[in-house]
Amino acid sequence: MNDEFKIDSHRFAQVRNARNTEIAEDYTEMIADLIRETGEARAVDLSKHFGVTGPTVNSIIRRLVREGLVESRPYRSIFLTKEGKLLADYCKKRHQIVYNFLIKIGVKKDVAKNDAEGLEHNVSS
């Protein structure tokens, strides 16, 4: 029973870490997109895009600041650090590769767009 608990807790930790990585990737990619499209990335825009509350966005941004991926000050735009830009660029390229692959195998564009968003996080580098 004790070994079974250790295995389950290990699996849970793996899933939690994978989800945290996915969130960091999605947020850095979206911050880069917002900066490119509108000139700035704001917490309210992230909240609208991801369909989450302001406090949820603020919590994630604080974590990304601790991880060295973004810079943020209260009531100001959010900026990517050098590391954040590298991650966002990497994720954007990986997303495009998955999307292009889905199109080549005959998946409709609207379906490929949605599916690529989920699949990109499950592709090993």
Listing of model-derived features with the role each one plays in the protein:
Residues 14-16, 82-87, 100-101:
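A ubiquitous short alpha-helical element
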Residues 14-52:
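N-terminal helix-turn-helix DNA-binding core of bacterial DNA-binding proteins
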Residues 21, 80-81, 124:
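Residue-level signal for threonine
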Residues 96-125:
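Amphipathic alpha-helical dimerization/coiled-coil segments
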Residues 76-95:
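Basic, amphipathic "hinge/linker" alpha-helix immediately C-terminal to the N-terminal HTH DNA-binding motif
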Residues 1-21:
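N-terminal leader segment of winged-helix/HTH proteins
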Residues 43-78, 82:
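Canonical helix-turn-helix DNA-binding module
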